[in-house]
Amino acid sequence: MTLDVGPEDELPDWAAAKEFYQKYDPKDIIGRGVSSVVRRCVHRATGDEFAVKIMEVSAERLSLEQLEEVRDATRREMHILRQVAGHPHIITLIDSYESSSFMFLVFDLMRKGELFDYLTEKVALSEKETRSIMRSLLEAVSFLHANNIVHRDLKPENILLDDNMQIRLSDFGFSCHLEAGEKLRELCGTPGYLAPEILKCSMDETHPGYGKEVDLWACGVILFTLLAGSPPFWHRRQILMLRMIMEGQYQFTSPEWDDRSNTVKDLISKLLQVDPEARLTAEQALQHPFFERCEGSQPWNLTPRQRFRVAVWTILAAGRVALSSHRLRPLTKNALLRDPYALRPVRRLIDNCAFRLYGHWVKKGEQQNRAALFQHQPPRLFPIAATELEGDSGAITEDEATLVRS
């Protein structure tokens, strides 16, 4: 998807990025970050397409302290990406260049874009599709943790899709190495995906800190969001949303959960454990029944004639199943008037019509607020204190601050 170009998106001149331009030809903009622009680029020698993340690190836009922070964070990201290179579900760093004013990171081109955009288009995903995505994500997280790396910013915007709808985990700007027994105290990430221990750590100087478990909490939030189309923790006042996170307050009450299995709800509940010690690890999550495949018995030794007969009966049975599934069930007027959204075919019709009419998702229940997906602040470091947290109408009151601390 090509994005509009603004004045701040102008390409670096040849002199400032000669080494990059000699090898790659930058094209249209396909994404933007807080301090970067992502463009499609073409390798001049081979014609292969890639994605290049361009970050301006000039004194004109950043202070000396900010410049050093950006450079250090980018170098740390590059080091981690090289360490985890080769994993099928982690983005591959192809090339990197650094000049006095710009830094360039060249990655694989993921043509399907962000999982966030895909979810916005689909509204909610099926359990089958969610199972495939979450298995790949947990495998990537397990690999990171095995290498003593914590990501700290897992969310649909940082999960990319290739042509085959396979995921790649990206944006390792907040990632860091974490040795056994070591704890972190830095507050970073996106509010809706922050684990309770991160918030508590920022409010209590005596808190021991947090570890790799924060990534599994974020996985639980992502799993919930993919199936419901809206996040588990949301309130129009951010201070109350943070309290919901710290207390683990979420519900399976929206209409989408009527069709979801108890197995996936159980997995979500074990990932969204407020106590990090009780939370599943990535390896344990992958062993959950939600990811189990039905293993058949030993293959039969059939003659060619027997195999042919089995194939014929299978085709006939599949045809009957397909035919019966397309037959409309009787629909009474009273049932339609009483609760049209409870009927799955009508529900999909309502969703599709609403999306085409308004161009965005439409709220259908009191517990739903898909707008929360679009209201998350960019990843950043932000202190949480009574004098600094804000709601939708200004600074929070002392009573609200007490709610969070309690």
From Swiss-Prot:
It comes from the Eukaryota. Residues 24-291 form the Protein kinase domain. SMART domains: S_TKc. Residues 306-330 are annotated as: Calmodulin-binding (domain-N). It catalyses: 2 ATP + phosphorylase b = 2 ADP + phosphorylase a. ATP binds at I30, G31, R32, G33, V34, S35, S36, V37, V38, K53. One of its GO terms (cellular component) is phosphorylase kinase complex. Its EC number is 2.7.11.19. It is an enzyme of class 2 (transferase). One of its GO terms (biological process) is positive regulation of glycogen catabolic process. The active site is at D153. SUPFAM superfamilies: Protein kinase-like (PK-like). This is Phosphorylase b kinase gamma catalytic chain, liver/testis isoform. The lineage of its organism: Eukaryota, Metazoa, Chordata, Craniata, Vertebrata. The gene is Phkg2.
